A protein has these predicted regions:
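Flexible, acidic/His-enriched mid-domain "rim/lid" segments that flank
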Residues: 3, 76-183, 194
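Short beta-strand segments
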Residues: 22-23, 51, 96, 190
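Short helix/loop capping segments that flank catalytic or ligand/cofactor-binding pockets
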Residues: 30-31, 59-61, 103, 197-200
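Short, basic/aromatic beta-hairpin or loop at an interaction surface
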Residues: 19, 182-195
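Short, polar loop motifs at secondary-structure junctions
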Residues: 52-58, 100, 104-105
């Protein structure tokens, strides 16, 4: 996964920045391997840090990719980020414009004392993820095969009188039996006239 850090550092060079702050859960997982809900990842030209609170310290150390150091913050995550930015000379910082809220942006401005410039690099991050590496392609194919096999397995269950939510539960159970970690979104099963409707949750219709 070093290639992903390399791609982040290419963004640093292209944008003329000293550091990047990854804050959204999808990008945190993609670039660090961490699956927890609360963290901030700071990437500089030579270092990478994942800042978490005490609840996620052990988990993070077991999940992060090589080249990323886990830092456990004590009070406020921005205090640790400020220390790191000062220590590693981060005066300009790229942030995720789609994830950082208005209040979050002002909090960064107030707490990161040595950071004089912040720039939205969301588009650059998203473009990096468009190009799938070999491992991603394998995982995508594995997910496709698993979903196909799970659907094939429940075909005998599809009979008149079965409720939509029962089919959804059966499909999710089948996928998890085969190794799925979960579903991407709530499973949608629609039968009869309801199959012409736009995305909706599965109901008790038969």
């Amino acid at each position: 996964m070093q290639d992903r850090l390399t791609r982040l550092r290419n963004i640093l060079e292209k944008e003329g920045l000293d550091g990047l702050l990854i804050s959204s859960r999808p990008n945190t997982f993609y670039y660090t391997g961490f699956t927890g809900t609360t963290s901030k990842c700071l990437v500089t030209k030579e270092n990478a840090f994942l800042v978490v609170d005490f609840r996620y310290s052990v988990q993070a150390k077991g999940q992060v990719y090589t080249g990323i150091e886990v830092i456990e913050h004590e009070k406020d995550v921005n205090d640790s980020l400020n220390t790191l930015c000062t220590r590693y000379g981060v005066g300009s910082l790229g942030i995720e414009g789609e994830d950082v809220t208005f209040s979050g942006y002002h909090s960064l401005c107030e707490n990161l004392k040595d950071v004089k410039t912040m720039k939205d690099i969301q588009d650059s991050l998203n473009r990096v993820r468009i190009i799938k590496d070999s491992e991603e392609l394998l995982l995508i194919q594995k997910a496709v095969d698993l979903a196909d096999n799970a659907f094939t397995e429940i075909l005998p269950f599809l009979k008149p009188g079965v409720r939509e939510y029962e089919v959804a539960l059966e499909l999710e159970y089948s996928m998890k039996k085969m190794g799925a970690s979960g579903v991407s979104f709530e499973t949608i099963i629609a039968s009869g006239p309801r199959s012409a409707l736009s995305s909706r949750v599965s109901m008790s219709s038969r």
